[in-house]
Amino acid sequence: MACMKKALPFILMVLLQIGYAGMDILTKDVLNKGMSIYVLSVYRHGVATVVMAPFAFYFDNPVIAQNLFNLGMKYTTATFAIALYNTLPAVTFILALIFRLESVKFQSIRSAAKVVGTVTTVGGIMVMTLVKGPALDLFWTKGPSAQNTVGTDIHSSIKGAVLVTIGCFSYACFMILQAITLKTYPAELSLATWICLIGTIEGVVVALVMEKGNPSVWAIGWDTKLLTITYSGIVCSALGYYIGGVVMKTRGPVFVTAFKPLCMIVVAIMSSIIFDEQMYLGRALGATVICVGLYLVIWGKAKDYEYPSTPQIDDDLAQATTSKQKEQRRTVIESV
């Protein structure tokens, strides 16, 4: 039971990333078919609010980032957008340092792993963005000439990259704010419901402004648009916010965001199969470097959880009866 409890945060985050990957594939499909990104955001949060509200009421008695990410993905490919979005853990880590949710001791191996992992992640992003390389002829694609016809020119790629990057920063700020809020408002179900409700209201305002004079965008039929709205609302907004909040309370925002590469891997495979999206060597190498960097961060965070810094370390040191014992315990803890 203790082992299962320890592994539960990892299992939940892996399953959540698989769920996110399905949403990204469906979202890319409906965007290619002309669905408004603003209307999609409204419906998604509306569904999530309806689903979460009864549970929050019984048990308990971030729209800007999503719009920018979806808009960026519209100008590029699903794989590229997800891979670029993997800077999220690095950005979250930097913001967590600023807001004192994370600590770094340069003589500590675990702190060095987090710093090196963050730098490695940024390096992987640069490789993926600047280096294209030859096309990879995967056995399930039609060959090197197969390409996604949406957003393949250089100007669209740059525009998409900028939008996704801004969206990434916005979502990192949201994660930090959620972590701070959970310290004083520990009801995860209620918080997730409020996030979805406020997201719906904000999304309606943005959609009415951006889609002014175009009421047809609100029409939804029995097609992939309805499937995308329902799936993303229940799995990615309702469950996503709730599970993220539960795990974040014990492991922190950096741990939650560090699992994004799993979503990228699933999206890359599914996109190449479903959309016949071309894979390039440069992006594959960059994605590999990103994964290495991010899991260095995960390792460092795991050690943080195993050997917490403050206030547990201070309490442990206070229990030492002699200065020699204090020095010995401090040396052991800080060397990990």
UniProtKB/Swiss-Prot annotation:
This is WAT1-related protein At2g37450. Belongs to the drug/metabolite transporter (DMT) superfamily. Plant drug/metabolite exporter (P-DME) (TC 2.A.7.4) family. It comes from the Eukaryota. The chain crosses the membrane at residues 7-27, 45-65, 79-99, 115-135, 160-180, 189-209, 227-247, 255-275, 279-299. Pfam families: EamA. One of its GO terms (cellular component) is membrane. Residues 63-126, 169-298 form the EamA domain. The keyword Metal-binding does not apply. GO terms for molecular function: transmembrane transporter activity. It is a multi-pass membrane protein. InterPro entries: EamA_dom, WAT1-related. Its main location: membrane. It is found in: Membrane. Keywords: Membrane, Repeat, Transmembrane, Transmembrane helix. Coiled coil: none annotated.
